[in-house]
A protein has these predicted regions:
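Short, well-ordered beta-strand elements
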Residues: 1-6, 49, 59-62, 81-84, ...
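N-terminal lobe/hinge region of extracytoplasmic solute-binding protein
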Residues: 3-55, 86, 154
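Extracytoplasmic
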Residues: 27, 46-48, 55-59, 76, ...
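Gly/Pro-rich hinge or "lid" segments in bacterial periplasmic/extracellular proteins
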Residues: 36-38, 130-194, 204-205
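Surface-exposed binding/hinge segments that line
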Residues: 63, 97-140, 158-165
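Extracellular/periplasmic solute-recognition and catalytic clefts
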Residues: 105-106, 162-173, 198-247
Length: 247
């Protein structure tokens, strides 16, 4: 349970409109490849079981893991990848539109294979495409993608929506049927049964919630508050850990 500052009126983090809950991206949705946080821009296969890139990086082929499923049980297929790219390219956020427009051609030789021909000159484009969120075509094709929504969207990630209370709090629940739970990249992760975010109007309100035990996790970015603001928590079951972040 974590206290955040702000509010939200949408659970779709892929569009320009509205104020979304950004955590939806990593908890509910997934990408073809998965990033390794302790290696510089290093990706490993996830929804894509294999990836094949030509020498000058102007073509890439992704092979979808046949075990990959959305949380409603529907299998992930090549058509979902094509739908995701075209939808985000045409209606997504500016970064999606910029990068995905560099895909000259996309084709599906079979239901698990996606081949893309790319504009030359961008050697990172293959990696960026690998981080593209995969959307379920059968859910989104009947919706107006560019409109904000508080509906409990379907993804393939380790968590699903439990409770959505606009502007107040949101709760995610671990999916016991998560398709990748036994894969090596998921071991030791996604250990919480529920994850809750409560929203406060200002930083002080969020801080007071933490001090009262209404929030169990807090990321402190204010040096002065870190130095003196936690003094009255001494003796309580609170662990303070300083992490050096290199930029």
């Amino acid at each position: 349970r974590e206290a955040l500052v702000g509010s939200f009126d949408s659970v779709n983090p892929f569009i320009i409109r509205g104020q979304p809950v950004w955590q939806v991206r990593d908890l509910v949705f997934e990408s073809l490849l998965m990033r390794s946080r302790d290696e510089p821009f290093t990706l490993y296969g996830h929804i894509a079981e294999t990836i094949d890139v030509n020498e000058d990086r102007t073509a890439v082929t992704f092979k979808v893991n046949p075990k990959a499923r959305f949380s409603d049980g529907e299998p992930i297929r090549a058509d979902d990848i094509v739908f995701s790219l075209e939808t985000l390219r045409d209606s997504g956020r500016p970064n999606h539109r910029t990068y995905y427009a560099k895909v000259r051609k996309i084709e599906t030789p079979d239901e698990l294979t996606v081949r893309m021909e790319l504009e030359p000159g961008d050697r990172e484009l293959v990696l960026i495409l690998g981080l593209m969120p995969v959307l379920p075509k059968h859910i989104f094709e009947a919706r107006d993608f560019e409109q904000t929504t508080l509906d409990k969207l379907v993804g393939s990630g380790p968590y699903t929506f439990d409770t959505v209370d606009a502007g107040d709090h949101i709760i995610f629940r671990r999916n016991p049927d998560y398709w990748a739970k036994d894969l090596p990249q998921a071991r030791g992760q996604y250990n919480y049964d529920t994850i809750r975010y409560d929203f406060y109007r200002d930083m002080q309100g969020a801080f007071e919630a933490f001090k009262k035990g209404e929030a169990l996790l807090r990321t402190e970015t204010d040096a002065s508050r870190w130095a003196v603001g936690y003094a009255d928590l001494e003796g309580q079951p609170v662990t303070l850990e300083q992490v050096e972040v290199g930029l």
